[in-house]
Structures are given as C-alpha cells and as structure tokens.
Amino acid sequence: MSQKGHTRSTFSGKLGFVLSAAGASVGLGNIWRFPYLAAKYGGGIFLLVYILLAMTFGYTMIVAETSLGRMTGKNPVGAFKAFGNSGWLRFGGWINAIIPILIVPYYSVIGGWVVKYLADYALGRSSALAADGYFSAFISNGVPAEVCFVVFAALTLTIIFAGVENGIERVSKFMMPVLVVLSVIIAVYSVTRPGALEGVKYFLVPNLAHFSWMTVVAAMGQMFYSLSIAMGILITFGSYMKKDISIEGSTRNVEVFDTAIAIMAGLMIIPAVFAFSGGDPDALKAGPSLMFVTIPKVFDSMGLGTPIGILFFLLVLFAALTSSIALTESAVSTFQDELGWGRKKSTAIVGVVMLVLGSLSSLGYGPLAGVRILGMQLLDFFDFLTNSIMMPIAAITVCLLVSRVAGVGRIEQEILLSEPRFRRKRVFNAMIRFLCPFFAAIILISSVANAFGWISM
C-alpha cells in the first residue's frame, strides 16, 4: 500500500537516537538475568567474554539493522521488500516485524508487576513484599495483576501517541539519565553493606574454575537479547535516523551504555544478595524470582529498605518502559507503513493486540493457569516462542540480507554518508558473512535446549 500523507518521523539528532536505542537495550534482562549469569559463569571472565562479543557480534548486528533502516526509510517488512519480493525476503521482513508485536504484551504484564511493587514500596509495605508467598499470591489473583498490566500498557501507549521526537525521544532523554543516577546510588549503597565486598569480588574477579564453553554461550545469548537485536527495533529506529548522524559512533555509544548499565546492575544486586545470604551464591536466581522475591527480602533486611526499594523499582520501571516503548513503536511503524494508517489508528490497533495477548499472559497465572502450551504457562510460552525461536531466526535473515543480497558495499556507502571511513569494516565483513549467522544458530539451539531442560543456562 502507498504511504500517502505519511511523512517519516525522525530523531532530532544523535543524542535522541542514542538514548532511545540505549533505552530499548536497557531492560529487564539487564537487571534480572545479567547479574545471575555473570555470577554463575565466572564473574570477570563472563564480563570479558560479554564485552568482546558486544564489540564484535553485537556491533555488527546493530550496524547492519540500523543501516538497513536508514537506507530504506522503512519498517522491517519494508526494509526487506526494498531488496526484492522473494518468499524468503517476505519471511525475513515479517518475522522481524511480528516479534515486537508478540513480545510487548507479555513484557507489559511484567511491567505491571513492577508498577505494583513500586506502589507498595511507596505506601511503606516493604515487610509485606518480603513475606513468603506474596508474589505468587499477587500474580495468581487475576484482577490486581490485570489492572497493573493495563496501567503499564497505558503509559507506554500514551508516549507512543506523542510521536518519535515529542514522545519517544523526549521521554528517553529524561528517563535514561535518571536511570543512570539511580543505578549509581543503589550500587554505592549495595557495595557498602556489611559483607557485600565478597559479592563484589565474586562478580568482578575472574574465576577460571567456572569458565567453560557454556560461559561463551551464556554471554552470547545475554548480549543478543540485551542489545535489542532481531526485534525490528533497530531497523525501525534506523529509519528515523538523519543521514548526518554517525551510525558507527552511535553504535559505540549504545554498546557502552548497555554494558555499563548491566555492570551497574551486577553491583546493585550481587553484593546485596551476598550480604543478605551470608555469601551464598545459590541465593542468586534469574528472572522474576530474583526481582520480586529475593530482592524484597534483601531490602527488608536493610536499614533503609523502603527508600532503596522505591529507588530500585523506579529504576526498573524506567528500564521496562523504555524497552516497551521501543517494542511498541516498532509494531506501530509496521502498521503505519504497510497499511498506510496514521499514528493514532496504528497505536490504537497495537493497543488492542497488547490488551488481548497481554491479558492472556496475565491471567495465565490466575484463572487461566490450567491452560498450557508445550507444558508452559502462556507468558512463558510467548517468551519461549519469541526469544528462543523467532529472534535467532530473524537475526539469520538479517545476516543473509546484508551479506547475500544488499551487500556489505551498500552498508559501507550508508555509513560513509556521515563519517570519513568505515572503521571496523573488516570486523563487520567477517562477522556478518560467517560468524553472526553461526552465533545466531548456536543461540537458537542452546535456547531451545535450555527451555526443554536438556542443558542448564
């Protein structure tokens, strides 16, 4: 369909793009998964592997997706169609476009849980939050969890309604600096607790005894999901990027921002849990149990548990919101471009999809708890489908598009529009042709194996 009357929005400049892209990258995975994996797989060794992968694999995928978006000025579907109309190109475009549509509903459910905990801390209920069974009782009680989900979704959609520059960019410019300040405050408080130093050492000092090939696989998977690769976000944001903004420079900024926040998350959580548990690394869990069960118990044991709890869940809310905004914008962009709809109509339709699929995920722990797919509750199934299967496949299609159809030369031409030379061209060329597809295949296999319990990550 034509896009009559639809003028492409843009970010105002490099800062707007970088903070928005960094906001997309900095999400719940940085806070509830990175510290756990770093502690489990050798601390400093895991960090080193993660940084090396971010500078190679992550860098290549960010540059590729951003360049495709800016080059074509399209959403993922349009970006792929710009190079042909073959079946696999249509498949590649649509899988990259559908992923955020499926992720943002259940992500908003978790965002609703964050809203609930922030409100409870603000009301001085830290002891209740730390009680055994509080979290499971909350998510299994359909109405409160559903209301919190709707509140979070409404916040996201309100920002999307405002547009790229006045909504996404403006909110990111406010939230991201505040998020950094909050992470520093909480990390300083955490590492100065009695007994916390052992946690700092456990997190930062390399432990070769814990190093194995799984360290590389785990770091690869975390980096892949953390940088918002293969979600259609970077292609969409790239299409909003002005031609005079450096793609390589912006990518470096996003890499640094995301890695710094992940490290700060480790310093916030691991020392605090160590201080609380008496140095027991088994107290560190990944996912909701860390954030909504362990952390409240840790905060309740601290002298300033309530104010730290407020700051922490405000930080988490900002991280969740910036990611949900990016996911929703990618979905809205697809409806705008492919159906020729305006922003308001596209946002409203995405909102309906969020409400329907999100309600299924939310109620899947309560009234719909008996409904399971492949033995998984509904939220877990949507997470498995998108993260473990669709995203690695989407990444492979991007690699094939760049290396086999568009050509690295086209990417270089796009990059040279805003900078004198393609500094990491050799790295990009080798990664996009050979290593990135291979790494994505490893992530696909290991993620599926982990989901079915064949390996433990």
Give the location of each predicted region.
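Extracellular loop-to-transmembrane helix junctions
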Residues: 38-64, 144, 390-394
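Membrane-embedded translocation segments of transport machinery
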Residues: 2-7, 11, 169, 173-321, ...
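Membrane-interface "cap" regions at the ends of multi-pass membrane proteins
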Residues: 1-32, 61-66, 70-83, 87-91, ...
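Transmembrane helix-boundary motif of multi-pass solute transporters/channels
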Residues: 13-53, 235-238, 249-252, 256-259, ...
